[in-house]
């Protein structure tokens, strides 16, 4: 969470876009976060937008939320109208609160449906497949490009990922071309 003065300093320094995910729906949020409320998160996003930041705002699927929670989260994201919507799929990591989370419901079909739903519900935003891409879409990754605008590569906040060269090769083999937004390898 940023104070207005901190956000203003970042904007004045040249920062244009900020990622501030909702992570889940309003009703499920207390199950995953105890440091601040959903409304504080929404208000922080509104403040950042009022300063002129482009927003990257998405969520994490597979933390125990219901299908209705996914829809509710996407409805709130649609209201925010971010430039970019990263959809992450839970990667349970040993030593974290969600390490033992049951992810058996995160089938390829379900995960693809979530991305399609994001595309339909937030049509003006770039839909991005982020964490979990290599796990949940193994063998069908090229299919993602029929639904999403971009994918993440080379790792995530808490887990490694497919390297950029392998990702670019996969994109090329699928008959697409790719651009790298960040030169950090």
Predicted regions and their residues:
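Distinct, well-ordered alpha-helical segments
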Residues: 5-14, 140-141
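Non-cysteine beta-strand/loop elements that form the S-adenosyl-L-methionine
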Residues: 10-26, 80-92
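Alpha-helix N-cap and loop-to-helix initiation/capping positions
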Residues: 33-40, 65-72, 102-110
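Auxiliary Fe-S-binding modules of radical SAM enzymes
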Residues: 78-185
């Amino acid at each position: 969470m940023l104070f207005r003065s901190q956000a203003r300093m970042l904007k004045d320094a040249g920062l244009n876009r900020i990622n501030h995910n909702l992570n889940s729906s309003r009703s499920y949020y207390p199950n995953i976060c105890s440091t601040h409320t959903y409304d504080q998160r929404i208000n922080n996003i509104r403040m950042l937008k009022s300063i002129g930041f482009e927003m990257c705002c998405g969520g994490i699927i597979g933390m125990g939320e219901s299908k209705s929670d996914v829809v509710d989260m996407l409805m709130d994201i649609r209201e925010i109208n971010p430039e970019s919507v990263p959809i992450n799929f839970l990667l349970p990591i040993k030593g974290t609160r969600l390490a033992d989370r049951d992810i058996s419901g995160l089938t390829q079909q379900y995960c693809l449906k979530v991305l399609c739903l994001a595309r339909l519900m937030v049509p003006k935003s770039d839909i991005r497949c982020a964490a979990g891409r290599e796990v949940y879409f193994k063998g069908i990754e090229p299919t993602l490009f029929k639904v999403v605008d971009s994918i993440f590569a080379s790792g995530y906040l808490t887990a490694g990922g497919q390297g950029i060269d392998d990702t670019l090769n996969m994109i090329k083999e699928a008959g697409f071309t790719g651009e790298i937004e960040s030169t950090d390898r």
